[in-house]
């Protein structure tokens, strides 16, 4: 049944992913969605549209051999890596740009979502702080970047332990619409344009006067993650809490970004200004600051969005250009490990499927196949007695027919009983292997706030001559006694993006403790296991690109860290407030959290310790350190694997390995006879008794020795 105009408008405004025609195959599907949403606003008029005013610009990656085309069509250019640019593009001009052969691709993706007292001991960061040189490190001389939401900039945790030094050096608040602070200027080979989102604040006075990020009255996440990575544990007045972060002497550069969690404070007309390309500008902002002060840098990104097969070609290319010696990005694996996320129908199998489920009103999925997909939906509703459900409609579709539709996108509205379900299908060449087909499927429960409120829906892929993989997006899978044969799902392929990217350090969560005592003396906590077992929620690989993920694990349950004292609805006097203290007339808090979001900054902080002793470490070298030093919960498994990666990080073993392999400093036993020994200051000594660094000459060679 064809959709009516009103239904089309409603459908275009869903969180769908739409594809391209041959002429617009240069666009990622999210860019295509932005254009169609913009067209819907124009077609149906402002009176029927939820948008007030113009939709504004789209922040996107553009690969082009002619930069003048971007200027011609009113684009502002914020950054470039050779012929790849990040630019704001007027939405009305995107299609026209794509008509030029010099424009090779325009890409953007949807915004992300957010995904330690004992942690420092478990992963031996405290042992690193307390060791003698060259094993000792505290993060001094290293920049930790944090891109997140909900920052309390006044928490004493950001000072040095003695409260003499405020360690946040600058912040770009992408959601700040005030006239305070300073604009952020994008720098490219062809000129400098002012970036049209947010304001930056530089220096202690400006940052403390700001007090909190623009979303600070409703969010807290970044205050917690940054505390785990680099909090000093300070409460002021000479008091140090037990909740010191992994790298307590590192300095910080912060970006407060846009996510699905804080989007309500941004005008809907500005939604396409905030994309994955905008997040790349945030990473660049942090790395540029580190470059300006000549220090190594590791960024914590405890956010992500579901992976796909076509959104991120340019994103990954640019990210690979950013990362390298002394430039590291850590990203959370995500918390979807307990969801049923994947179906595989091999050649020779006639049918595989499951029932659909979603926490929102729509469920979307992507598929990879050798041939166009044939699929089937069955809708079950109450029978006339109202006591049991029966199959009311069976809907089948062969995607070979999509070529007959405009832009190879099929939209339909199905009337099942008295309820409407909008369906959208599209197909295109697969990103990683052009010989394969990628397809997208979205179904929305138009008349209800939650998906499948009154109707159970099963899904199956068909055809013994085709190999088909189905991956979750906004929906997942479940079983149902209405058809017990449809339970072909697996709990794999749940690593979020950009954690799925090869050169990103992907962090999963382990469990060690089951309780935390709050400031009131009450005992709370979540029991996900002990002794370093993977939590059930921690994302599982492989990534859609085939990479083994995660790379490494860290504690992610019952983690106590700093939290945002400005959040109005947090009610920190309850179980989440593990400790309360007052500094300069304001109450501040330590609170409990869980998730791969909490595990990721522990790894970020440990890598900062490692960068202190070897500032040129690359992502590949860090993974080599993991391979030789991580601890293994289950020795019967081979490592790396798609559950634990290389295992749980060990800060001290890592530094020992780095010193031995990458800095040339190692600890070993020597015979002093026949050798001339000098201390680090060049003074001759008779023998080696104290711990320290020595220079030894035996007439054949000169070498460093560490005791």
Where are these regions (language model features)?
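Autoinhibitory N-terminal propeptides
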Residues: 19-135, 143, 261
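N-terminal domain-start motif of subtilase-like serine proteases
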Residues: 30-52, 93, 112-164, 204-221, ...
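C-terminal subdomain of the subtilisin-like protease fold in secreted/lumenal serine endopeptidases
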Residues: 49-50, 265, 296-298, 303-311, ...
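Active-site core segment of subtilase-fold serine proteases
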Residues: 151-223, 227, 245-247, 293, ...
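Hydrolase catalytic cores
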Residues: 226, 253-260, 287-297, 326, ...
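Short acidic, glycine-rich surface-loop motifs adjacent to enzyme active sites
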Residues: 257, 281-310, 332, 455-465, ...
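Residue-level detector of functionally pivotal "anchor" positions at catalytic/ligand-binding pockets or at interdomain
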Residues: 655-681
């Amino acid at each position: 049944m064809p959709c009516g105009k009103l239904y089309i408008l409603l459908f275009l405004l869903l969180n769908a992913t739409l594809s391209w025609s041959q002429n617009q195959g240069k666009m990622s599907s999210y860019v295509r969605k932005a254009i169609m949403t913009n067209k819907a606003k124009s077609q149906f008029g402002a009176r029927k549209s939820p948008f007030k005013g113009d939709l504004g610009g789209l922040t996107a990656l553009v690969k082009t051999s002619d930069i003048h085309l971007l200027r011609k069509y009113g684009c502002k250019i914020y950054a470039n890596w050779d012929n790849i640019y990040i630019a704001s593009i007027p939405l009305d001009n995107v299609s026209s740009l794509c008509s030029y052969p010099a424009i090779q691709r325009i890409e953007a993706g949807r915004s992300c979502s957010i995904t330690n007292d004992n942690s420092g001991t478990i992963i031996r960061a405290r042992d690193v702080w307390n060791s003698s040189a060259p094993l000792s490190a505290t993060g001094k001389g290293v920049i930790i970047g944090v891109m997140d939401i909900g920052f309390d900039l006044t928490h004493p945790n950001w000072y040095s332990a003695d409260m003499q030094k405020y360690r946040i050096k600058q912040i770009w608040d992408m959601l700040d619409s005030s006239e305070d602070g300073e604009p952020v200027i994008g720098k490219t080979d062809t000129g400098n344009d002012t970036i049209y989102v947010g304001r930056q604040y530089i220096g202690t006075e400006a940052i403390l006067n700001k007090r909190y990020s623009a979303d600070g009255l409703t969010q807290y996440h970044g205050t917690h993650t940054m505390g785990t990575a680099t909090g000093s544990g300070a409460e002021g007045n000479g008091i140090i809490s037990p909740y010191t972060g992994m790298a307590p002497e590192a300095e910080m550069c912060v970006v407060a970004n846009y996510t699905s969690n804080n989007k309500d404070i941004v005008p809907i007309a500005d939604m396409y200004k905030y994309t994955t390309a905008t997040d790349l500008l945030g990473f660049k902002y942090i790395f540029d600051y580190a470059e300006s002060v000549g220090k190594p840098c590791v960024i914590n990104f405890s956010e992500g969005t579901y992976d796909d097969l076509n959104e991120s070609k340019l994103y990954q290319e640019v990210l690979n250009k950013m990362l390298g010696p002394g430039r590291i990005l850590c990203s959370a694996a995500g918390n979807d490990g307990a969801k049923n996320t994947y179906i595989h129908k091999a050649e020779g199998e006639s049918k595989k499927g499951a029932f659909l489920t979603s926490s929102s009103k729509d469920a979307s999925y992507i598929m990879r196949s050798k041939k166009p997909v044939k699929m089937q939906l069955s809708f079950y509703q109450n029978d006339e007695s109202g006591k049991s459900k029966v199959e009311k409609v069976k809907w089948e579709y062969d995607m070979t027919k999509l070529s007959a539709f405009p832009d190879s996108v099929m939209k339909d509205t199905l009337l099942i009983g008295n309820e409407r379900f909008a369906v959208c299908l599209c197909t295109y060449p697969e990103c990683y292997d052009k010989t394969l087909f990628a397809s997208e499927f979205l179904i929305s429960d138009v008349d209800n706030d939650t998906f499948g409120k009154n109707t159970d829906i099963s899904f199956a892929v068909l055809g013994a001559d085709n190999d088909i993989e189905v991956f979750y997006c906004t929906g997942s899978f479940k079983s149902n006694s209405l058809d017990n044969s449809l339970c072909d799902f697996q709990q794999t392929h749940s690593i979020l993006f950009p954690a799925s990217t090869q050169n990103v350090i992907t962090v999963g969560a382990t469990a060690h403790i089951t309780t935390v005592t709050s400031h009131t003396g009450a005992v709370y906590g979540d029991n996900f296991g002990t002794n370093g077992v993977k939590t059930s929620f921690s994302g599982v690989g492989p990534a859609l690109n085939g990479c083994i993920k995660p790379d490494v694990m860290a504690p992610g349950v019952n983690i106590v860290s700093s939290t945002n004292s400005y959040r109005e609805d947090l009610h920190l006097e309850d179980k989440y407030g593990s400790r309360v203290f007052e500094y300069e007339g304001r109450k501040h808090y330590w609170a409990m959290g869980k998730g791969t979001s909490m595990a990721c900054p522990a790894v970020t902080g440990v890598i900062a310790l490692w960068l202190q002793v070897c500032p040129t470490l690359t992502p590949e070298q860090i993974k080599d350190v993991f391979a030789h030093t991580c601890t293994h919960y289950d020795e019967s498994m081979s490592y790396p694997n798609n559950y634990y990666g290389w295992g749980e990080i060990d800060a001290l073993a890592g530094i020992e390995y780095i010193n031995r392999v990458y800095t040339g400093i190692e600890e070993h036993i020597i015979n002093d006879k026949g050798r001339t020994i000098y201390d680090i200051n060049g003074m001759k000594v008779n023998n080696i008794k104290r711990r320290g660094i020595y220079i030894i000459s035996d007439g054949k060679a000169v070498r460093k020795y560490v005791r």
